[in-house]
């Protein structure tokens, strides 16, 4: 192809992503688009075709983003090349959404015609607006008996500020509206900007490890071209490689001769080092280098931390390798080695949220065969010492002694909760119990409200979302953004078994909630720790002060059973001997903490 032909081809490229609240039918609609355009043969079609992980299909959610090239002949008679970049809908994976949007010019915003606008819909709209994307609203699931199109169109106008007349109606189940969506993509989303004659600039928006091809980055070409044999340089890591292969996803890999501006695909270059490929980095040509990297997506910081330890201690190295490989296409995952007296060697690991933490643990177990124990999740605290120093603490065991601390600040979040009006009282009660401060209540319509709360992040990382769902019978939706740090009355609480501190059970608690939290943990441990030959005290302590205690009674052996008749002093002598033996056992005895006790404690909050 000559330059003019390539420029003409570029005018017929459309890059778009599909964004939606979790469970609004995004993956199903993507399936219908792929089926209608003939991208996927009906014989090999399976539900959620772009959700390549088994875990995604089982849970019915999208975790990783996926890109696929679609060829579509429009009503104007021209053939268009479309790149659909599928995105997750859960709040924890908004970084995946931001990566997708950095590679697009437009987005299809899917809204469930029965449920209406949800909290995450709102968050995704703001992300799209920040990226200057053209938004095409689509009302999905209009075939449901409970669908209320006029009401949802009114919500689009009032809550999102978009023109409701431009909203399309569709059904991912029946395929209704797919042609309208494709035609709107052609007419409303602009072709990609980019100059074929400028030095190569390609944005890495994802990557994964292939045991034969090495590290494979997914890229969006902004300027220039790339083909087999080119010398390329990764601008952040400054590493140079020779391109072995370029191609696109369909959704399996299809090798191409070259990739030009607007193309979304992949390249391989026998990259063996995981650290050389960073998501958000720019690839340029080694011989004709771009001066500046592309303004990439924003780097997301981990906000929830926990210790991950292998159940079988000899699998430490496999766990390390698993985390390194998962980090490759999940740039927000961070980890560093740590050790615990109770659990041995493991890693302090950072995540974007609780679902993210759960998914990573499950992937380690499924893909690498390593069962892990996770300690209680915590957030990053700002600790100011009496000398004026500021410490960042994500692990309770790193907290200095109380005498050395001037004040502790914890992160707060701005929470947006949408729910039916009848559940306002329950939502407010739950949020107040989690130390929340009400900011605003706004009626979306006569039945639904939007409630804004300021909440400590440490309070929602346990079971806030689960409780919210059960209190509102599943009707509430929840989204949050990190706000600033605020001073709180926080203290470190230690759990002692037989007088010894168990470091893996230490946690940072609010002073007002310390007693009930300590009492709950002691009761849980009493239930799950098996009896020993000696008595085991379980204590919760704030500094030197014990605030809660439970005792596991000793197993009793009847040492007087062999006596018959005779002197009572003989009986007393044997009981005294047993008492001394138990006292000695107690000083020497170690209490083993079973894994199920750890898991039960995580569920107590």
Curated annotation (Swiss-Prot):
CDD domains: EF4_II, EF4_III, LepA, lepA_C. The keyword Glycosyltransferase does not apply. It catalyses: GTP + H2O = GDP + phosphate + H(+). It is found in: Cell membrane. GO terms for biological process: positive regulation of translation. It is a peripheral membrane protein. One of its GO terms (molecular function) is GTP binding. Belongs to the TRAFAC class translation factor GTPase superfamily. Classic translation factor GTPase family. LepA subfamily. Required for accurate and efficient protein synthesis under certain stress conditions. May act as a fidelity factor of the translation reaction, by catalyzing a one-codon backward translocation of tRNAs on improperly translocated ribosomes. Back-translocation proceeds from a post-translocation (POST) complex to a pre-translocation (PRE) complex, thus giving elongation factor G a second chance to translocate the tRNAs correctly. Binds to ribosomes in a GTP-dependent manner. PANTHER family: TRANSLATION FACTOR GUF1 HOMOLOG, CHLOROPLASTIC, TRANSLATION FACTOR GUF1-RELATED. This is Elongation factor 4.
């Amino acid at each position: 192809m000559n330059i003019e032909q390539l420029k003409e081809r570029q005018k017929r490229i459309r890059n778009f992503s599909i964004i939606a609240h979790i469970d609004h039918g995004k993956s199903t609609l993507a399936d219908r688009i792929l089926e209608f355009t003939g991208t996927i043969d009906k014989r090999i079609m399976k539900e959620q075709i772009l959700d390549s992980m088994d875990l995604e299909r089982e849970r019915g959610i999208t975790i990783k983003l996926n890109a696929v090239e679609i060829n579509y002949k429009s009503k104007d008679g021209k053939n268009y090349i479309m790149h659909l970049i599928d995105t997750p809908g859960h709040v924890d994976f908004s970084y995946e959404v931001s990566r997708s949007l950095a590679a697009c010019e437009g987005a299809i915003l899917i809204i469930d015609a029965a449920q209406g606008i949800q909290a995450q819909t709102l968050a995704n709209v703001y992300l799209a607006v920040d990226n200057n994307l053209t938004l095409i609203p689509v009302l999905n699931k209009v075939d449901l008996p409970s669908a209320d199109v006029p009401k949802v169109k009114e919500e689009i106008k009032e809550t999102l500020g978009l023109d409701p007349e431009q909203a399309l109606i569709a059904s991912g189940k029946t395929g209704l509206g797919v042609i309208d969506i494709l035609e709107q993509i052609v007419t409303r989303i602009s072709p990609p900007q980019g100059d074929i004659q400028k030095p190569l600039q390609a944005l890495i928006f994802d990557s994964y490890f292939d045991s034969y091809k090495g590290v494979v980055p997914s890229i969006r070409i902004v300027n220039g071209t790339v083909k087999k044999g080119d010398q390329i340089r990764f601008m952040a890591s400054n590493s140079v490689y020779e391109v072995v292969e370029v191609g696109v996803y369909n959704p399996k890999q299809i090798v191409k001769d070259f990739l030009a501006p607007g193309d979304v695909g992949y390249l391989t270059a026998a990259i063996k080092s995981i650290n050389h490929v960073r998501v958000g980095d720019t690839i340029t040509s080694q011989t004709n280098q771009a001066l500046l990297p592309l303004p990439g997506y924003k780097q997301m910081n981990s906000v929830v931390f926990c210790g991950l330890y292998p159940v079988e201690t000899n699998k430490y190295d496999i766990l390390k390798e698993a985390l390194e490989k998962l980090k490759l296409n999940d740039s927000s995952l961070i980890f560093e080695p740590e050790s615990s007296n109770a659990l041995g060697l493991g890693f302090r690991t950072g995540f974007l949220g609780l679902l993210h933490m759960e998914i990573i643990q499950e992937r380690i177990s499924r893909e690498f065969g390593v069962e892990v124990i996770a300690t209680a999740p915590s957030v990053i605290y700002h600790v100011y010492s009496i000398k004026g120093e500021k410490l960042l603490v994500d692990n309770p065991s790193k907290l200095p002694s109380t005498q050395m601390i001037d004040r502790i600040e914890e992160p707060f979040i701005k929470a947006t909760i949408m729910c039916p009006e009848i559940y306002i009282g329950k939502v407010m009660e739950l949020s107040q119990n989690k130390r929340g401060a009400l900011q605003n209540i706004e009626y979306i319509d006569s039945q639904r409200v939007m409630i804004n709360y300021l909440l400590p992040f440490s309070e929602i990382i346990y079971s806030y979302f689960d409780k919210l769902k059960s209190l509102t019978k599943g009707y509430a939706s929840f989204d949050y953004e990190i706000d600033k740090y605020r001073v709180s009355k926080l203290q470190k609480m230690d759990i002692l078994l037989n007088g010894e501190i168990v470091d893996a059970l230490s946690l940072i608690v609010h002073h007002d909630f310390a007693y009930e939290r300590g009492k709950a943990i002691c009761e849980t441990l009493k239930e799950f720790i098996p009896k020993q030959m000696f008595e085991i005290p379980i204590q919760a302590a704030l500094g030197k002060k014990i605030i809660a205690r439970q005792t596991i009674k000793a197993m009793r052996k009847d040492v007087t059973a062999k006596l018959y008749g005779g002197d009572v002093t003989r009986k007393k002598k044997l009981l005294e001997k047993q008492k001394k033996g138990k006292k000695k056992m107690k000083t020497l005895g170690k209490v083993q903490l079973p894994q199920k006790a750890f898991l039960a404690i995580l569920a107590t909050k």
